[in-house]
Amino acid sequence: MAGATATAPIISLMSFKRAAKTYDEEALYEYAVGALGRRMRTVAEIKRLMRARVAAQPEGELLVEMVVMRLKAQKYLNDAGYAESYSRFRKENEKFGRMRVVQDLKIKGVHPEIIDKAVHAAYDDVNEEQLAREFLRRKRMAKPADQKQAARVFRALVRAGFASRVIFRILKKWDVDEETIGMLEEGAGG
C-alpha cells in the first residue's frame, strides 16, 4: 500500500440559502415590539426595519402600515414623544446645540413640525453660549493656544450644532487673535 493515495471526499461549498421567512401581521408586530423594546424609534425607523423583513412579500407594505397603526394606537410608537425625549437627552447629557438635534431628527425621519415643537421646548430657556462652554468642558477642550487649536475648537462646535455667532463670541472671550477669527469667519462664510 505504499503507492496508494487516499482521496478525501469533496465537500461542496455551495451556500444553502434559507428560505425567506414570511411574516404575517402578528409576527411582524412581535418583531416591531422587540425592536422598540431595545430602544425608542421613530415611525420612519420602524417602517424601514419592517420593510426589510417583508420586501419579498406582495402584501408587505400593507402589513407594515397595519402594524404601524397598531403600534400608534397602543402608544408604543410616537414621533412627538420620541423627538421631545431625544432633544432633551442630547441637550442635557451630550450638550449638543439646537442645529445638531434638528439635523439628527430629520435624518431619523421625524416630521419638520414635530421637530420644531420638540426642539423649541427643549432649547427655549437655554443660553447657547453656556451650553457650548459645557460641551467644550465635556470634551476636555481647553482655550486654544494657536490657529490650529482654534480651528479644531471651531470645527468641534460647528459639528455639535452651535451657531457660528456663538462660537466666535466664545473665541473672542478667549482672546483668540483677530487674524485667526477672521480666517475662521471667512471659511465659515460668515
Listing of model-derived features with the role each one plays in the protein:
Residues 2-190:
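An alpha-helical, amphipathic repeat domain used for nucleic-acid recognition
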